[in-house]
Structure formats: structure tokens, C-alpha cells
Swiss-Prot record:
Chief location of this protein within or outside the cell: membrane
Gene Ontology CC: one annotated term: plasma membrane
Keywords: Cell membrane, Lipoprotein, Membrane, Nodulation, Palmitate, Plasmid, Signal, Transmembrane, Transmembrane beta strand
Compartmental location: Cell membrane
Keyword Cell membrane: yes
Organism annotation: Rhizobium leguminosarum bv. viciae
Database matches in InterPro entries: OMF, OMP_efflux, RND_efflux_OM_lipoprot_NodT
PROSITE patterns, per the entry: PROKAR_LIPOPROTEIN
Covalently lipidated residues, kind S-diacylglycerol cysteine: 18
Protein name: Nodulation protein T
Amino acid sequence: MHSFRLAAAVLPLLLSSCMLGPDHAPPETPLPEKFSEGAKQSAGDVAVSAWWDSFSDRTLNQYVASGLDENLSVQQALERVNAAAADVTIAGAGGLPKASHTTSGEIGKGGDITSTQNISSVQLSLTWLLDVFGQYRRSTESALASLDSAHAAVDAAKLALIKDLVSSYIDARYYQQRVSISRANLKSRQETYDFTNLQVEAGAASRQDVLQAEGLVRSTIAEIPRLELNFRVSAHHIAALLALPSETVIKQLQKSEGQPVYRGKINAGIPADLIRNRFDIRQAERDLAAATAQIGVAEAQLYPAITLSGSITPSYIKQRGRHGGILKWSFGPSLDLPILDGGRLRANVETSKSDAAAAYISWKLTVLTAVQEVEDALTAVRRDVHTENSRRRQVETIEEALKLSTASYTDGASSLLDVLEAQRQVSSAQASLAAAIQQLAKDHVRLNVAIRGGFAAPKVASPREASTVAAANANIQSAHSP
């Protein structure tokens, strides 16, 4: 009786004992007050900002809405969350009581060879490894941090999808624009070629002029297939991200043209925003927390393990019309004390400490890389704006020069070479403008991704906008359903 009272008094003290190992504290690192080309105003919570809406492109909006539902990478990341949640249960299970039940029955001869003996019994066993030094509590703490890291990985998968999808859409529209430019130039050059043939018949042009005009026509025809190929490659990638047939996406894109232009404000916030908004920083911090908790797990293994165990076994015996019951029970503690292990347990502690130190370095590197990514993207966007404006003015100037050269050639005041050179310059300037628009749009994407905006944005696509993609998905699912 006294032993039970002693156990009842000591047990709460053992279970409430402190855990070994360091407690995790959120790491800190000095950051600049502002980005070199940014403002001093915080951007706030950018996670819910659907920045792709600033392109004012309904097709793009419907693709993003559909992609977040259908993308396999996002679904794969969600499955990792489920696995991490199960690991939390597994990590804490070792510190909980374990019960088992065994039922047995046997028949045999008794002491008298003419009698039969029937014995049936039930055994209920209970074991409880007391988490005196916090091994399983630290293990659970580590697993919970890993679960948080898995949730951050889902956010990473969502934003990676959005970045890939929007960038591929920008590329597809760029190649569409290039094809349109080349076809318009082909028409103009074909007209010049036809006019030159008429000039030859009238004796006002030479065979060399015809060959030069024809060469420019052939050159333009030759560049179109490559541009069409690149358009289709971009469309194929969009289809893969949306789990749609390529033909469906190509037909949707061919219904309209025009490069997406970002119309939103440039608001990169301040470096301190990145600690809150960048899920890769949050993921690195959670990985550090998990590694720190593992130090406590390793240190707890250096100390004795105390296990309480007990069992109760009622048995029923029947022989020659007589029967009776027997009750057996046992209860007691056991102590497992590590003495000689060749230094393995202490080496585990050192390994855990090194892993935690490496996790801190990884966190700090992630923070510094995040700041650089925003700095680079912000600088690129501001310069891209000037480049696009200059390219646009260049196109206007050269197109005006082409008109003057064409009119002068028609009047016989200048040579065909002047017209052909002006056409080449127009073609080059138009291609450069399209590339500048593409680069500006993609750098806006890069900036918004760098500040980690939009991964938790609500779906804003209306049913009318998303009807095409939704109908295509429904047809695919019905075609593959049994």
C-alpha cells in the first residue's frame, strides 16, 4: 500500500519535469530599413494580393483560378502535409501508455489420463514509458515544426505554379505578337516585291532590285515557323500545368491576341516584410525549430528510461465436472540505463547540435537571398519601364521613316535599297519592342514573387470567366471515369 502511495506522489513530479535541450527562439538578423530603390512604407500582408489581376487579362485570371485547383505539384505538397501530420502522432505515441490484450484457450490431459482439462485465459497488459526527460515531448515539438514547414511548402508550390503559369502565358502572348508582326511585315515586303517587278517591266528597276526584295520576303517567311513553334511550346506547358489537352489551350489563346501589360503599382515594401511574407523564410525558421528540438531528443537518450508495466490474467479451468478461476497480476517499474555504447549517444547529441547550427545558417542565407531577389527585381522593373518607352518611340520614328522612304521610292527619288533597309529597321524595332514588353511583364512577375505576394489570394474568377476551362476539365474527367 505504501508503494502505491509513493508512486502516486512521485509520478506527477516525474511527468512534469523539465525537458532537456534548448528551447527554440525565433532567430534574428539585421536588415536594412529599405530597399535601395524602394520606399520606406511596409507592403503589409501581400499574401492575399492577386497581383496577376493587374494585367487585366480575363484568360490569364481563369488559368490561375483553374491551376490552383488542378495542379499536381500543389496536390503533391498537400499530401506531404498529411504525412507530416501523421508524423506528429507517431512522434508523441512513444510517451503514451500502451495496452495489449491476449486471449488463449487450451485443452489437454490432466493428472488423471482419463480426464480432460480445459483452460481459458485472458491477459491485459499495460506499459508506460515515462517521458521524464522530455524525449517524446521534444520529438512531438520537432514534428509539429516540420508540419508547419510542410504547410509553408504548400504555399511555395502554389506560388511556384502561379509564377510558372503567368510567365508561360506572357511568353505565349509574346510569340503570338512576334508572329503577327512577321506576317504584317511579310505583307508589306510582298507588296514591295510586287511593285519592284512592275518597275522592272517598266524599265525603272533592275533584276538585282527584284532579287533583294525577294530575299527579304523569303527571310520573313523563314522566321515565322520558329515563332509558331515557340508559341505552341509555351501553350503546351500551360496545358500541362492545368492538366488540359494542348489543343484546348491553343484554341483559347488563338481567340485573342495582345501582350499582357502590368498596370499595378510598384510596392515592394521593406525588407522586414520578408520575414512575415516569405514562406521560404518561414519554412527555414520552422526547420530550425525542428532541428533545435532534436537536440533535446538526443540529450534525453543519455539518461535512464523508466517504464511502468503491469498485467492482469484471469484464467478459468474446467476438469471432470469441476471448475474454478485463477487471477494473476503483476505491476512494477523497470529502469533502462545506458552505460556503454561506444560514444554513439553523445555523438548523436553533437550531430543534432551541428544540424541545428546548419539550419540557422540556412535560415540566414534564405533571408539574405530574399533581400537580393527583391533588390534585383525592383531594379529590373524600374529600368524596364525606360527601355519599353524608348523602344516604343523608336518604332514610331522608324515607321515614319519607312513611310517617307516608300513614298520617295514610288516617286523615283530614292533607291529600293533605302526602302528595304527601312523595312529591316522597322521589323527589328517592332521585335525589340515586343521583347521589352515581355521582359517588363516578366520582371513584374519576378518582383511580386520575390515579395511572395498572392499565394493565399482568394479566387476572383467568375463562373462566366472560368466556364471554358471548367467545361474542359469536366469533359476530361467524364472521359476517364469508369
